[in-house]
A protein has these predicted regions:
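Short regulatory "switch" loops immediately downstream of catalytic or recognition motifs
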Residues: 1, 25, 98-102
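Aromatic-residue hotspot detector
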Residues: 11-14, 135
């Protein structure tokens, strides 16, 4: 009888341990699926950003954008910035940010960000816009290397000139960042003054397969993902500077560092 009692105790202990294991296991979030979802989201965002850039480059209303892009130190692309508005407007969307090396003209791999903000005013309807921010100064680039930055507060932002015949010379060249948007909704123009641009660390980590910071990606350039090459190549061609004498593309602006591959 003693051996039966001992067996029962052992069985009870195993059942207890199994219950604890099952409970703890269910409490742990599904890290792998979440990581996979982040990776997929990041990959899709990079491709959508490429399509947004291409659409801006082919838009007759974006002549000033094309000219100013050649002078930009960085480019932040949000393929879809959603904004719902009625008295109080709230906006939000994901974006990728790439930085140009001033010495070589080569563009970095993309770092992932989110744009969010709220505004108060008499507004009607909702809006979905493609938005590209041209970062025109070192201060603008540096501000985006932190965890978050408030546009119009920590760094100056102004709307870029849009429309057929709009000249780059009419842009507010004192602004650190110039914003350009193509609206799909009921009211045009996106005011980003007061919006917050913040790093999406999870997307950065998932896309590059390890923990990385914006500085790792944009400055040190030691993060790689070949999927970004199509975006970088399109940006390199679009932002290539022309020599004033011959009107030819500068070689340094066209030769892209293969380190992202």
């Amino acid at each position: 009888m003693k051996w039966m009692n001992g067996s029962r105790k052992i069985a009870a202990q195993w059942l207890f341990l199994f219950t604890i294991f099952l409970t703890v296991g269910l409490a742990i979030p599904p890290v792998v699926p979440a990581f996979a979802n982040d990776q997929q989201e990041a990959t899709q965002l990079v491709e959508k950003a490429r399509l947004t850039l291409d659409s801006f480059m082919s838009d007759n209303n974006m002549g000033a954008f094309r000219d100013l892009l050649k002078k930009a130190d960085g480019v932040l692309i949000s393929p879809e910035l959603l904004k719902g508005a009625f008295i109080i407007g709230a906006s939000g969307g994901n974006a990728v940010f790439l930085v140009r090396d001033k010495k070589t003209g080569q563009w970095s791999c993309p770092a992932f960000y989110t744009i969010g903000g709220a505004s108060i005013g008499l507004q009607i309807g909702g809006q979905a816009s493609e938005v590209i921010l041209l970062v025109m100064s070192d201060r603008g680039v540096t501000s985006l290397l932190g965890n978050s930055v408030k546009l119009g507060g920590n760094v100056g932002v102004a709307a870029g000139p849009v429309g057929i015949g709009a000249a780059a010379s009419t842009a507010n060249l004192s602004a650190d960042i110039l914003s350009f948007s193509r609206s799909k909704g009921l009211y045009g123009g996106v005011s980003l003054d007061g919006s917050v641009v913040a790093v999406r660390s999870r997307l950065n980590d998932a896309y590059y397969g390890r923990q990385v910071s914006p500085t790792d990606i944009l400055v040190r350039r030691d993060a790689k993902n070949a999927q970004a090459l199509a975006l970088i190549e399109d940006l390199s061609k679009s932002a290539a500077k022309k020599s004033t004498a011959m009107g030819e593309l500068l070689p340094m602006a066209m030769s892209q560092d293969p380190s992202c591959g």
